[in-house]
Amino acid sequence: MRDITPDLCDKYESQVTLLNLPLQNFGQRSAFWGEIVTVRCYHDNSKVRDVLSQNGKGKVLVVDGHGSCHKALMGDQLAILAIKNDWEGVIIYGAVRDVVAMSEMDLGIKALGTSPFKTEKRGAGQVNVTLTMQNQIVEPGDYLYADWNGILMSETALDVA
């Protein structure tokens, strides 16, 4: 376990913004960071699967599920896919499922809540678009730093050492 965001705030206060969303921790990895990749979708996780199928080394996926906790946008199978493809973590403004299994996986996972319902698979959604969640903007290509203290974003990569 490692606290990174307090030190980053102390060192880079003028360069970071807080992604202030009421998210819970679901993955085993307590701290994670990387370049932001975005997906916007609603009750359809097809694009989430497409993105997590790609190499995620040094990247964090941020998913805008419109804040809906009716259907889970990620479960254990997508978490396994993310780990296989070296993703650092996933932030979901929506729901996840299979939370006991994911709690034992070495992946950073934060989400609004849980739902046992799966999503539809219609191929709907957008990839690498600017997201606005609770009046907060998330840009693909920026950098995200997360731990149990919070989530920070920066336009440039920061030294986490």
Curated annotation (Swiss-Prot):
Cofactors: a divalent metal cation
Binding site for a divalent metal cation: D98
CDD domains referenced in this protein's UniProt entry, alphabetically: RraA_family
Entry annotated with the keyword Metal-binding: yes
Keyword RNA-binding annotated: no
Catalysed reaction equations from the record: 4-hydroxy-4-methyl-2-oxoglutarate = 2 pyruvate; oxaloacetate + H(+) = pyruvate + CO2
Binding sites annotated in the UniProt record for substrate: G75, D76, Q77, L78, R97
Cofactor detail note: Divalent metal cation.
EC number: 4.1.3.17, 4.1.1.112
Highest taxon of the lineage: Bacteria
Gene Ontology molecular function: any one: ribonuclease inhibitor activity
Residues that span the membrane, as ranges: none
Enzyme class: lyase
Protein keywords: Lyase, Metal-binding
One Gene Ontology biological process: regulation of RNA metabolic process
Function of the protein: Catalyzes the aldol cleavage of 4-hydroxy-4-methyl-2-oxoglutarate (HMG) into 2 molecules of pyruvate. Also contains a secondary oxaloacetate (OAA) decarboxylase activity due to the common pyruvate enolate transition state formed following C-C bond cleavage in the retro-aldol and decarboxylation reactions.
Record family assignment: Belongs to the class II aldolase/RraA-like family.
NCBIfam families membership: NOT-MenG (TIGR01935), PRK09372.1 (NF006875), PRK12487.1 (NF009134)
Subunit architecture: Homotrimer.
Record's protein name: Putative 4-hydroxy-4-methyl-2-oxoglutarate aldolase
Lineage start: Bacteria, Pseudomonadati, Pseudomonadota, Gammaproteobacteria, Vibrionales
